[in-house]
A protein has these predicted regions:
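Structural detector for short beta-strands of small beta-barrel domains
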Residues: 151-174
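Short peripheral tails and domain-boundary helices/loops at the edges of structured domains
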Residues: 229-248
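Short, Lys/Arg- and Gly-enriched loop/turn segments at beta-strand edges
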Residues: 219-232
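N-terminal intrinsically disordered, low-complexity, charge/repeat-rich segments that act as generic
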Residues: 1-148
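Beta-strand/loop nucleic-acid-binding surfaces
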Residues: 182-205
């Protein structure tokens, strides 16, 4: 029987791939093994031997390591750590501002002009945590050479939608889009949107039903959300939009 740490690592690897697959498939992050990662994760064959492939996601890995270190977790791909990064959970609260500040300065500081560098580095003392949305709205949009528009940030953030129809490889969800309201980030009125739930017959939302809530990343249904995960995602999303709006 695998050790408990191996089980936590394996489930964390699956969870990471659920969210990382589609941007990896689209060529935005990670290496070139997206089909292998999807197959292994969707068929329950993910194990710690896949970790070297996951470390190629160089945007996410520093945040995972920060969360793990702050919580005394050896493996940055532990399920609890991965969940904290993508969806938010209690592990985020234990990350000290000074530690996130140091990580951001070391990893991204040299890639930002002085004014933007100062703007990003002021966010940890204001309450920012190593949460995916923080990277999207307060780091990623400043790192790209070309302007990152609302459409890219909207696709890149982890959102949630309630399933209204299931149709083969796709589901239709009611989902709130990211919008600008009086020059500030906000969530708009829910709108129907069709998202993929499987690719070449493989996916992570096979048992979804009308009325379920799913997380969405780059038009991909990552998983069915229980009440706890949905509440955490909503909470940490609102928190980081508030922080982003201070300097938008």
């Amino acid at each position: 029987m695998p050790a408990q740490t191996d089980l936590a690592s394996s489930s964390g690897i699956v969870l990471f791939i659920r969210y990382a697959f589609m941007p990896n498939h689209l060529g935005y992050c990670g290496g070139n093994e997206n089909e292998l990662l999807l197959e292994r994760a969707a068929t329950g064959q993910a194990d710690p031997r896949l970790t070297p492939l996951l470390t190629q996601f160089t945007g996410a890995t520093p945040y995972l390591r920060s969360i793990a270190a702050a919580n005394g977790v050896r493996d940055p791909f532990d399920r609890r750590v991965v969940e904290a990064y993508w969806l938010g959970n209690e592990l985020l609260a234990r990350v000290e501002a000074r530690d996130l500040y140091q990580m951001l300065e070391e990893r991204f500081g040299a890639h930002l002009p002085p004014k933007l560098r100062e703007q990003v580095l002021r966010k940890p003392p204001e309450g920012a945590k190593p949460f995916h949305l923080f990277h999207v709205v307060d780091v990623y949009r400043h790192l790209e050479r070309e302007t990152v528009g609302m459409a890219a940030m909207e696709s890149c953030r982890i959102s949630w939608g309630q399933v209204r129809a299931v149709d083969g490889a796709s589901v239709t969800v009611d989902r709130q889009p990211l919008v600008l309201r009086e020059g500030k980030f906000a969530l708009g009125e829910a709108q129907p949107e069709r998202v993929l739930r499987s690719f070449d017959g493989l996916g992570f939302a096979e048992d979804v039903s009308v009325g379920d809530w799913v997380s969405v990343h780059w038009g991909w249904a990552c998983e069915v959300l229980d009440d706890r995960k949905l509440a955490n995602l909503r909470r940490w999303t609102a928190h980081h939009l508030t922080i982003a709006n201070r300097t938008i």
